[in-house]
C-alpha cells in the first residue's frame, strides 16, 4: 500500500492538534469544576448567562471556542476566588476608582461600543459557551487548575508582574502571585 508522506504527516499533525484541543476541553468532575451551578443561581441563572455571554462576546468574539471558554473560565475563577464579587454579573460589571477616574475590570463595560451585537454567530457561540461553563459542562482544564485570574490581549503591555500561565489565541493568561 502506498502512502503520500506529505499527506500522511499533515493528517497526523491534524489528528494530534485535535486530540490536544479535545484534552483541553475535557469536562472537570462537577465537584472540582466551577462552583457556580444552576442550583445555586436559582432565578438569576438567565441574568448570569447574559452577563457571562456579554463578557465572552466583547472580550473574545473572534476567538476560537477554546479562547471564549478561557475568558469564561477567568470570569468564573474570579467569582470563586473570594477576592471579587460573588456573582458573574458582579465580576463583569465591577468598577473601581483609580486616581479619581472610573476603571472597569473589563474595558468593554466602560465603553458605549458594547451596546450592539454585530455578529449573530459569534453571539450565539458566546451564549453556548456561557451556558456550558456556568453548568460546569465544560471547563478550561489548564486555566481552572492554575486559577487564572487575569488576561490581556497580546498587543497590550500592562505593567503587571504576575506569573504567566499560557497564551490562547490573542490573549495571555496570568495567575496571582503565590503568598510565601
Where are these regions (language model features)?
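Bacterial N-terminal signal peptides that target proteins for export
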Residues: 4-15
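C-terminal segment of classical bacterial N-terminal signal peptides
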Residues: 21-28
